[in-house]
UniProtKB/Swiss-Prot annotation:
Coiled coil: none annotated. FAD binds at residues 41, 49-52, 61, 67, 110, 399. The record marks 293 as: Transition state stabilizer. Keywords: FAD, Flavoprotein, Monooxygenase, NADP, Oxidoreductase. NADP(+) binds at residues 59-61, 183-189, 206-207, 292-293. Its cofactor is FAD. It comes from Streptomyces coelicolor (strain ATCC BAA-471 / A3(2) / M145). It is an enzyme of class 1 (oxidoreductase). This is Baeyer-Villiger monooxygenase. It comes from the Bacteria.
């Protein structure tokens, strides 16, 4: 398809994004007998986060047999925690196995989409043209748009600058003085991967992280053969991994003080590698473990102990040419800056492009904080669902479990529309959205994410946790098993518009009636 070719089509469902959420939605649509759908992807291939993040050492911190679809088990995972290239290959395999290729529209970034209150459908403008859809599933994910802090003087830096999610593989770090900004999940994988080759590595750490050892190993050929021959063993392995994490949830959500034992394990992990008391003090968090995402690595601390690594216990505040200045005044020279500063999680950029029934964008609606009914649907945005929406994140388990629960909800949502018949839309009642989010926030009050004494990317600008689910994945699955129509307004075309259709066919008259709302 030529660039900017104009496409005008109407589909039953448009899915935005082709990571785990988007491909999972596509598989579920086909299983529901829906083939009239497209998957709009801004890049040139599938993979989402696992396509965009290809930095050295990139891997998942959830065991691979749990970080995969239940309907697409993979007996060939090479390691307990497989690397980015294997996860991306798995997603390509899913696209092929389930016949998703004909539905994929690559290089089709959504520029704007708006709800048509007369036609009861979404008009979607992409870089390749315009299409309309009865239902839109936004599966862009919270880790899709990198966040780079606005550092004074950064434009004066003469060297190389890039974000971990936009790694420049053409730039050779060997022999360079490199500054790593941030100490999150990406940084703890990058640091040990580049430390042996760089001349000097300076880590700017605003807040230290709790790091637990990562018990990773190669999965033997015999194990893989067993999983191929007896698929039930793969299911059993997955079930055990899931069950262990479900049991851990109580400590995060109801009894944070029980995490003290886990803190001692993390401190021993640090002490085994970091012998310098001053460096240990820099790396020891002053908040409860679990308040920020617990990181897994058995190589991070050993790398920080190497003689060519400096840890600055302060965030980067200014750049003066090739000199980087921390908030505490510490200075360091660098040839390259790598930002491991996370993503736009609580202010997802896609929200600025989605215009609802009242003419406001989703970003404007969420200005006071993200809210959605059961993590997926927002009031004023009919027939629109977000996969991995507000308060669907997890602090200790696999997001694929949450995605599959949301896909159950999506499937029932579409069934309800079919039962209602005709041109119909469902719009969450504001009271239902408020009630759901009140329940979530009340449960959040006791969790370690709210009481642990830290500021994390789970929190929005007002300090409210709009990211994490304060319960087990089994609880969320029960909450999203069925759509309760009492929580929705049913929208239909106004009678005048319906009655005018025959006349419109004969005269070409344009009807402009508003939609009728049913209880």
């Amino acid at each position: 398809m030529a660039e900017h070719e104009q496409v005008h089509e109407h589909v039953r469902v448009a899915v935005i994004g082709s990571g785990f959420g988007g491909l999972g939605a596509a598989v579920r649509l086909r299983r529901e007998g829906i083939t009239d759908f497209v998957v709009l992807e801004r890049a040139g291939s599938v993979g989402g986060t696992w396509r965009d993040n290809s930095y050295p050492g990139c891997a998942c911190d959830v065991p691979s047999h749990l970080y995969s679809f239940s309907f697409a088990p993979n007996p060939e995972w090479p390691r307990t925690f497989s690397g980015q290239e294997h996860i991306r290959a798995y997603l390509e395999h899913v696209a092929d196995t389930f016949g998703l290729r004909p539905h994929l529209r690559f290089d089709s970034e959504v520029k704007r989409m708006a709800w048509d209150t007369e036609q009861l459908r979404w008009e979607i403008e992409t870089v390749r043209g315009t299409l309309t859809a009865d239902v839109v599933v936004s599966a862009t994910g919270p880790l899709s748009d990198p966040k780079v802090p606005d550092i004074p003087g950064l434009d004066t830096f003469p060297g190389k600058v890039f974000h971990s999610a936009r790694w420049d593989h053409d730039y050779d770090l060997a022999g360079q003085r490199v500054a790593m900004i941030g100490t999150g999940a990406s940084a703890i994988q990058i640091v040990p991967s580049i430390q042996p080759k760089v001349d000097r590595l300076t880590l700017f750490q605003r807040t230290p992280a709790w790091v637990m050892p990562r018990v990773d190993r190669a999965i033997s050929g015999a194990e893989r053969a067993l999983h191929r021959a007896l698929p039930a063993t793969t299911k059993l392995r997955r079930g055990l991994l899931w069950g262990i994490r479900e049991l851990q949830v109580q400590a995060f959500t109801k009894h944070p003080n029980e995490l003290g034992f886990v803190e001692q394990i993390a401190k021993r992990n640090m002490g085994a590698a970091i012998k310098d008391p001053a460096l240990r003090a820099k790396l020891t968090p002053d908040y409860r473990i679990g308040c920020k995402r617990i990181l897994l690595s058995s190589t991070y601390y050993p790398a920080l102990a190497k003689p060519n690594v400096d840890v600055v216990a302060s965030g980067l505040s200014e750049v003066r040419g090739s000199t980087l200045v921390a908030a505490d005044g510490t200075e360091a020279e660098a040839d390259a800056i790598v930002f491991g500063t996370g993503f736009h999680v609580t202010d997802m950029p896609i929200a600025e492009r989605v215009v609802g029934a009242d003419g406001r964008t989703l970003a404007e609606t969420w200005k006071g904080g993200m809210e959605a009914l059961r993590g997926g649907t927002a009031a004023g945005f009919p027939n629109f669902m977000t996969v991995i929406g507000p308060n669907t994140g997890l602090g200790n388990s696999s997001m694929i479990l949450m995605i599959e629960s949301q896909l159950n909800y999506l499937a029932d949502y579409l069934r309800q529309l079919n039962v209602l018949g005709g041109r119909t839309a469902l719009d969450p009642r504001p009271a239902a959205v408020r009630n759901w989010n009140h329940r979530v926030q009340e449960r959040m009050k006791r969790t370690v994410w709210n009481t642990g004494g830290c500021t994390s990317w789970y929190l929005d600008a007002s300090g409210r946790n709009t990211t994490v689910w304060p319960g087990t994945t089994a609880e969320f699955r029960r909450e999203t098993r069925r759509v309760d129509l009492a929580e929705y307004q049913v929208l239909r075309p106004a009678p005048a518009q319906v009655g005018a259709k025959a006349a419109e066919a004969d005269t070409g008259a344009d009807t402009g009636a508003d939609a009728e709302v049913s209880a």
